Amino acid sequence: MCIIFFKFDPRPVSKNAYRLILAANRDEFYHRPARAADFWGSNNEVLSGLDMEEGKEGGTWLGISTRGKLAALTNYLQPRLNRNARGRGELVAQFLTSDMDSLSYLKKVSAEGHLYNGFNLIAADLSAEKGDVICYYGNRGEREPVVLAPGTYGLSNALLETPWRKLCFGKQLFLEAVERGRELPRDALVAQLLAVLSNDEAQLPDPAIEAQGREYVRPILSKYAAVCVRCPDYGTRTSTVILVDADGHVTFTERSMLGSDPTRWETTTHEFRLQS
């Protein structure tokens, strides 16, 4: 599972402010193969981690391109999965390489949403010329995607802004870190946000998670109900912070688990300027 917090301010009042601040955790089985975030060999405009699971190779959960296209995915918690459904990671990868705008792309996805297990998809076009646009679609919610107003949002494994306790708790920590970061250099803000993503305090009880996940989630509820998930074979493997400033400078920092060892981590940062 995953969790995402983001603050969207397309016209920041200060040159030192950010058009987008995003902090996200990817939770996955430790044995599932993946590549750490880097620019794609086949397309050096796109930066993301990559799923390397057999049959799902090339999918991703979060990425951004130098053209200003950004997408992020979470699974929708459901007790049973359709093993014949299409891989959800392709939804992010296809948008990052497409020429479609975010709303048009999500409208296309909404027509095919029944082919996938439950998911939530954020798609954004970041352009100083045309204005930043962020859209959302979840295939377990409304039939049409929505354009998001500027503001701060939280998304986990239910629909956007569903008030799971861990989402509300994490969103408050995120807001506090962003507020403190107004007076801090970029690296310090990134460190504050990574600390938020590392919080493993279980937010219990949470009957909403239990009701949605039923028998699938009950055995791991005490671990799952935290921003940072820590189970023996499953949990938070990657934490990502993306900052986009008023001038279109992007800072993409990823903290990723080395192998299957939750005591060993590596942090890398990529920086570039948006083309538009």
From Swiss-Prot:
Residue stretches spanning the membrane: none
- Output the InterPro entries linked to this UniProt entry: TANGO2
List GO BP terms, alphabetically: Golgi organization; protein secretion
Q: Which GO terms describe its cellular component?
A: cytoplasm; cytosol; Golgi apparatus; mitochondrion
The UniProt entry, under Pfam families, shows: TANGO2 (PF05742)
The superkingdom of the source organism is: Eukaryota
Tell whether Transmembrane is among the UniProt keywords: no
The answer on whether this UniProt entry bears the keyword Mitochondrion reads yes
Keyword annotations of the record:
Cytoplasm, Golgi apparatus, Mitochondrion
User: Where is it mostly found?
Assistant: cytoplasm
Location(s), subcellular: Cytoplasm; Mitochondrion; Golgi apparatus
* Record function comment: May be involved in lipid homeostasis.
The entry's family comment says: Belongs to the Tango2 family.
Its protein name is Transport and Golgi organization protein 2 homolog
Gene name in the database record: TANGO2
